[in-house]
């Protein structure tokens, strides 16, 4: 009987340990959400709803920038869903980055007139196409080009 008890205990403990290892632990992060906040009531409603989320450590509401910042062990999708459940259906994750983080802030995809001061929209930087017209223009005025003087 001792061997059977040992084996059953071994396999049952191994099963529970593997379940515990599969469960992901949430990481500490800051979630920024853009949501239109009109009045004190809206601000209070959003703050109460978001602070009730399990794992939320701090909640800051900036009415001027239409921004809600949540710090803690939270899931961004869950925070967004909670803000939308308060009646703010147009809530979205913060689409802006600081002006200094973008190489070309006035590019067509990055510049946004509605962005708060000091911020531009998140966008991928445009990559140069191989064989683009820039290369052709550079070789047009090159010293190695025998027909360059005809253009000038």
UniProtKB/Swiss-Prot annotation:
Binding residues annotated for a metal cation, in chain numbering: 39, 42
Domain HMA: 28-91
Domain of life: Eukaryota
Tissue expression profile of the protein: Expressed in lateral roots and mature anthers.
Entry keywords, A to Z: Cadmium, Lipoprotein, Membrane, Metal-binding, Methylation, Prenylation
Removed propeptide positions: 150-152
GO CC annotation terms, alphabetical: membrane
One GO BP: detoxification of cadmium ion
Location(s), subcellular: Membrane
InterPro entries referenced in this protein's UniProt entry, alphabetically: HMA_dom, HMA_dom_sf
Modified-residue entries (Cysteine methyl ester), positions: 149
Keyword Zinc-finger among UniProt keywords: no
Primary location recorded for the protein, binned into one broad class: membrane
UniProt region (Disordered), positions on chain: 123-152
Annotated GO MF terms: metal ion binding
Lipid-binding residues (covalent, S-farnesyl cysteine): 149
Pfam families: HMA
Changes seen on gene knockout: No visible phenotype. Hipp20, hipp21 and hipp22 triple mutants are cadmium sensitive.
Annotated Polar residues bias: 142-152
Complexes and interactors: Interacts with ZHD11/HB29.
Purpose of the protein: Heavy-metal-binding protein. Binds cadmium. May be involved in cadmium transport and play a role in cadmium detoxification.
Similarity comment: Belongs to the HIPP family.
Protein name: Heavy metal-associated isoprenylated plant protein 22
The species this protein was found in: Arabidopsis thaliana (Mouse-ear cress)
Gene behind this protein: HIPP22
């Amino acid at each position: 009987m001792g061997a059977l008890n040992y084996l059953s205990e071994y396999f049952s403990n191994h099963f529970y340990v593997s379940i515990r290892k599969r469960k992901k632990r949430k990481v500490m992060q800051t979630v920024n959400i853009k949501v239109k906040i009109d009045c004190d009531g809206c601000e209070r409603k959003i703050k109460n709803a978001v602070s009730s989320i399990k794992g939320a450590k701090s909640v800051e509401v900036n009415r001027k920038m239409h921004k809600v910042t949540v710090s803690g062990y939270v899931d961004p999708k869950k925070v967004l869903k909670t803000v939308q459940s308060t009646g703010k259906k147009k809530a979205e994750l913060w689409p802006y980055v600081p002006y200094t983080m973008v190489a070309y802030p006035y590019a067509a995809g990055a510049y946004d007139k509605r962005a708060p001061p000091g911020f531009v929209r998140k966008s991928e930087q445009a990559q140069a196409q191989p064989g683009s017209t820039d290369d052709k223009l550079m070789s047009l005025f090159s010293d190695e080009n025998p027909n360059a003087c005809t253009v000038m």
